[in-house]
Amino acid sequence: VYKRQVQMGTRFVTTEECDAADAYKQAYLSARKEDIVIVKSPVGMPGRAIQNAFLEKVAAGERFMTGCRHCIKTCDPKTAPYCITRALINAATGDVDNGLLFCGSNAWRAQKIERTVDIMEEMA
């Protein structure tokens, strides 16, 4: 039996139930289509993220690699521009100017904070 499936993490970031900081959610609500960019993470994998002050500093050559815990084998603290763990924690806890805001390609479509149950009913 074949069933169609989708991955919809981005849609649930801007829900009341999501525990990300309000500033993180607001970054999604404020994002424009052209703000969604492909970044190369310190572990070498590409990902989509919302362009912000942090990514601008990284693009300008600033490094944010302190206190490496060697949590990801493919990350080399000698060459990585930033600690991905720290950047993700910064963003999720509300320090969006010093964090990495991973997102899906449709993050810019977020219009409001809504309840998960309402999203699920809309999809039913």
Q: Where do the model's predicted regions map?
A:
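Conserved active-site-proximal phosphate/metal-binding subdomains
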Residues: 3-124
